């Protein structure tokens, strides 16, 4: 006879809950989950309703103790901000999960679902899920409050240039737009001889001053004025002013250098033409094609002025033009321009066509001029030059005429211009009636000088048909490859509504 061993199944033991008597698996507390939750609330101390401040003007949330941050709805940044509001109570429990519960954007409510754990009776760990309701309260931030009170700026940059032309400011405006340096400005104000930039902090203004020093030759002075002070906390409220002065030289200006400066630049002639102003002043000697760059420090050490202003430009017609092939260079001469050709021309004023008076001069435009072409220049022979360096020069070394650039039909150039520029949104006051002509001069400079326009964002104007890079007269134009597509421009920047064109 064989005995069969009975299979014994081991099942976990059960105990009765000490509160309600329900059979449960053994646990350190000897109590069921329902009774444990009724006796212990691990979320006690965590507020179920919290207020959070929101500025409607700038769309920012208040982050204690004194900062305002930009956060999108249901973003990680906003979730972190909400959790910081209950950071102290949450430090007593273990946060397992957190997330937003969807609410209507206009409801002024933010709901955050939290999952927490905490050790309770005899080492038992209890997990609980609950929702914290955040009430969004409107509160104006300090920056917006100062804007509404017309006391919004903490620092201002006053950019000035003592010239009759604004070419440098137009170039400066395009660089500011390209590199986004206008984003921290509260207000930009245009006056007759410059621009004012207003900032909410001194640090933003200092960053702008450093940017200006890197793109144009300039110098600045800083000052500050005490607005208020608190003797109890020893805090002071200042308004800072940065006065930035740009060198008073623009493109196409004729200048006379001091003998010492001309000698230090490679014995170049004192009478030079400014062909470009970027981070330095680029000069060319029309008699030898010698070029030199003068930075801001050199200019302020050896200052010089423009001999003529743009309104004194006169139109000449080319009678005869020849290229100078063999140019003798003296010892110690500087760099010669490879982009220009030295030429000798006979010219006559278009206003004196009924006379036989002609002028002879050398020019750096030998590669552009042909008999019959029109060219713009300054008549130094019949001009009253009030300059200390010119007065000390030998009259034989002062040219009768200095040619600046070839003249084209401006009306045709404007009609065929298939590109546009953006402009800064700014307040204007006391605008000169000559501003439009000066702006057209700047646009023509961009077409003629590739070195300048490579730093400028140029946008294609879809309303103008695409043509060749040069027109019938040979006037330079900007190629389509150099233009950008702009989907935000709705007005032409060269028109009256150009001030609002900023994306």
Swiss-Prot record:
| Gene Ontology molecular-function annotations | protein-macromolecule adaptor activity; ribosomal large subunit binding
Q: Name one GO biological process term.
A: positive regulation of protein localization to nucleolus
The residue numbers the entry assigns to motif Nuclear and nucleolar localization signal are 405-422
Keywords recorded for this protein, A-Z: Acetylation, Cytoplasm, Nucleus, Phosphoprotein, Protein transport, Transport
Report the residue ranges where the short sequence motif Nuclear export signal is annotated in this entry.
Answer: 480-489
Where would one find coiled-coil regions in this protein? none
Q: Which cellular compartments is it found in?
A: Cytoplasm; Nucleus
Q: Which residues carry this modification: N-acetylmethionine?
A: 1
Read off the Pfam families from this record.
NMD3, NMD3_OB, NMD_SH3
Acetylation in keyword set: yes
Can you supply one Gene Ontology CC term for this chain's record?
nucleus
Modification Phosphoserine, positions: 258, 468
Query: Which InterPro entries has this protein been placed in?
Result: Nmd3 (IPR039768), Nmd3_N (IPR007064), NMD3_OB (IPR048898), NMD_SH3 (IPR048899)
Is Secreted found in the keyword set?
no
Q: Give all Phosphothreonine modified positions.
A: 433, 470
**Which parts of this chain are annotated as the region Necessary for the nuclear export of the 60S ribosomal subunit?**
425-503
Task: Tell me how this protein assembles.
Answer: Found in a 60S ribosomal subunit export complex with RAN and XPO1. Interacts with XPO1. Associates with pre-60S ribosomal particles.
Q: Which family does it belong to?
A: Belongs to the NMD3 family.
Q: What does this protein do?
A: Acts as an adapter for the XPO1/CRM1-mediated export of the 60S ribosomal subunit.
Protein's name in the database: 60S ribosomal export protein NMD3
In the UniProt record, what gene is named as encoding this protein? Nmd3
